[in-house]
Amino acid sequence: YLSWGFSVININYRLANTALAPAAVEDSRCALYWVINNAEKYSFDTTKIVTTGFSAGGHLSLTTGIMSPETEFDKQCPSHDLDNKFDNKKVKVAAIVNWSGITDVEDLIAGDNKRNYAVEWLGNNITNTEIELAKKVSPINYVRSDLPPILTIHGDKDTVVPYAHAVKLHQKLDKAGVVNQLFSVKGASHNYFSKQQTQQIYATIKEFLIKHQLI
């Protein structure tokens, strides 16, 4: 990304062993506010913000990029203007590059694809309260027509974050008329792409960003 002319901000967020959901979502949203509020200081172009991440980072790149400025997860941000003087029109991204990200948290705690790591993130004791929170932090539930372009990269043999999550998001985005692309990595698991596959992935990302005039 640096070689493509981007300024890169690699954020830290609270993990499950430090704070349960929705802390990571809040931290990532706050990072977006920080970027926008510090754009002049660091010469960031806020019309070309791209969120990206792998696995949990893919999930957070989606939630950060597609939630509306009025979301409850912004309220704890130090830079959030509680008097509503902040220009909400600026709180948006130009594109999202999602690598193997979770799209439906509810599915991972109470659905067909239940995973222990997701249950732990919600606090292990899953009640209706946790299920409602899972819905709120699921990117699939924020799909609407005015979203930025989204590129999803996912191995079709991924069993950690089911490949079905990528397919489901792609289908729902298509139905809503959102510009998006699903790059399926054939035979790839969750945490391994071959050198050739990695080269293909980055070529696809670059082509995607050029297409949307972000490079």
Indicate residue ranges for each PLM-predicted region.
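Alpha/beta-hydrolase superfamily serine-hydrolase fold, recognizing
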Residues: 1-215
